Amino acid sequence: EISACLVGSEMCIRDSPILVNFKDIILYHLRRLWHFLRTWHWDGKRFYHLYNLNTKIVLIVTFLLLVLGTVGIAVFEWNASFAGMSVADKWTQAFFNATCPRTAGFTSVDLAGLGVQTLLIYLFLMWVGGGSQSTAGGIKVNAFAVVVLNLVAVLRGTERVEVFGRELSHDSIRRSNATVVMSFGVLLLFIFIISILEPGTSLLAITFECVSALSTVGSSLNLTPRLGDDSKLLVALLMFVGRVGPVSYT
């Protein structure tokens, strides 16, 4: 089963078995390698549709988020939270803390001790989340990529939104834009209400807790235990919305 369906001359991104496609890709290249070892003749045939569109988008965006997140965290925490560590440990910590905001929410440092810039990187990574059909939360890298591609097309003044030589369908663009707008709307509403219920609390800390809850990450600046009962219920509701609400269906 491929991950994208043709709609006229357009390409419509759907939920797809990315891991299955990735497995097929690995097996294909292993077979080519085994054929070369047996015959010492390299099979030059290429199957250009081996990588489906969804797999390409997820792999590329995930790679970029990991690289940029790792470099960004390393730059801002090199002589701060990572001070006293070896160079190898600093890069390991940076990579680990760039990966976990989009997945399990594990942490190897006290998040409350991180700089504002690093926390903003955390917020962005938590908000984007993982790929579709994964257990990660967020708006999904697929929706994020489509929205960015649509923005690029608008800035260029073109009506067609293309990637890898194929045009994305209006349905994919519409669903992705709706997901992003809905995510921002829910976050703004809950952040606004909690900021009223918790006067004097840092707006950045409230935002961090809300984004973490909606993206079902689990990271915290140790604010939630100090919240009032009403605010805790709102945070719990955000977790529920992030897991079973429309945001999770992208």
Task: Tell where the protein language model's regions lie, with residue ranges.
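Membrane-proximal intracellular helices of multi-pass ion channels
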Residues: 3-4, 9-10, 14-249
